[in-house]
A protein has these predicted regions:
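N-terminal cap/lid segment of alpha/beta-hydrolase-fold proteins
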Residues: 30-76
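Short beta-strand element of the alpha/beta-hydrolase
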Residues: 76-86
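Conserved alpha/beta-hydrolase
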Residues: 101-121
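Alpha/beta-hydrolase active-site loop
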Residues: 127-148
């Protein structure tokens, strides 16, 4: 009998150990998944707090954001900024890094995921639109203006890369936005419709429309949009344009990779460019005046001409700042290249 009890006890111990190991493995996987979900490509400053928030745009899409606040602001009513971009990135990447820095400088800052991307709502996933993404900035202004510690008459916005174009477009129509800054600005409608440096021919444009039009039959039959295998190559061959290599160095390496970023993964839908090729942004750029514009671009950025052309076409007050030796993606995360002191002085001067 004692022997039988011993065997039973031993068996229970083995089963208990196996169960404990299984739970430990499950907990580890859960922790790893949580760490991936909560992964940021930068360290949070000990001078600020970060809080996950949600809000809706006027199309009813729930947007996800992170609200950064300076710890020393207390009950003070302060100026605020909304930040988004780059095009195809998420708030845990560049926009969060900018928010982190600008909150240190005394602003309430909202970094957010645009509609249909990241943790924000909208289906199908990974689509963009001149209308929706312009509206996303105004929805962010709605949210900031409802915060008890924000002066709703002192709200500005920052757009990075393609969201620089949307930030300018939002500022044209939303007169609550008192100042706008862009870094490494892209006009997504222009590059989609005309190609880089406006070199797309009429024949190439027609072929692009034909290809996407036929793709719509496939998408309609399947009941879901098609995606490319990957936005960027998994490995570089070496003969890619330099700006593609630069994008790879950010999005496909630990420097900037994030599982929610479509630029790090499979990319936009194959038909995503349709509306951008037919609906130009920035038609009324002069109407931002008399509110100020700050355009920041890298000296060696392939995208520099977008900022230069906006500067030519916009009315005063406006300023173009060229960062020596910088390429496009340097202004995503290289804090020694991004002129945060200039951004601070620009917004403090114009949000008062």
């Amino acid at each position: 009998m004692k022997k039988l009890l011993f065997i039973l006890a031993a068996s229970l111990m083995v089963l208990g150990q196996a169960y404990a190991q299984k739970k430990q493995t499950e907990n580890k996987k859960t922790m790893e998944k949580t760490e991936q979900t909560n992964h940021y490509t930068f360290e949070l400053s000990d001078k600020i707090t970060r809080q996950k928030v949600t809000f809706k745009n006027r199309f009813g899409i729930t947007l996800s954001g992170d609200l950064y606040l300076p710890k020393n602001s207390g009950k003070e009513i302060i100026a605020a900024l909304a930040i988004s971009g780059p095009f195809g990135a998420v708030k845990e990447q560049s926009s969060g890094l900018y928010a982190n820095q600008m909150a240190e400088r005394g602003f309430a800052v909202l970094a957010f995921d645009p509609s249909y991307t990241g943790e924000s709502g909208g289906t199908p996933r990974n689509i963009a639109s001149p209308d929706f993404n312009t509206e996303d900035f105004s929805a962010a202004v709605d949210f900031l203006g409802l915060q008890k510690n924000v002066d709703r008459n002192k709200i500005g916005i920052i757009g990075i890369c393609g969201f620089g174009g949307f930030a300018l477009n939002a500022t044209i129509v939303d007169k609550r936005i008192k100042a706008v800054a862009t870094t490494s600005m892209y006009d997504i409608s222009r590059v989609s419709a005309k190609g880089y440096y406006d070199k797309m021919t009429a024949e190439e444009r027609t072929k692009a429309f034909e290809k996407m039009s036929l793709q719509r039959w496939v998408d309609a039959e399947n009941g879901t949009p098609a995606y490319p295998p990957t936005h960027l190559p998994e490995k570089l061959k070496g003969d890619e344009p330099q700006f593609v290599k630069d994008y790879f160095d950010y999005y496909k390496t630990p420097r900037g990779y994030h599982k929610n970023s479509l630029n790090s993964n499979k990319g936009w839908t194959i038909t995503n460019a349709l509306s951008f090729m037919n609906m130009p942004l920035l038609t009324y750029i002069k109407e931002i005046s008399p509110r100020p514009i700050l355009l920041i671009a890298g000296e060696n950025a392939h995208s520099r001409y977008f900022s230069e052309d906006v500067y030519k076409n916009a009315s005063e007050p406006k300023e173009l700042m060229i960062i020596p030796n910088a390429v496009h993606v340097d202004l995503y995360d290289k804090v020694n290249s991004i002129p945060f002191d200039k951004l601070e002085s620009f917004f403090k001067e114009n949000l008062k």
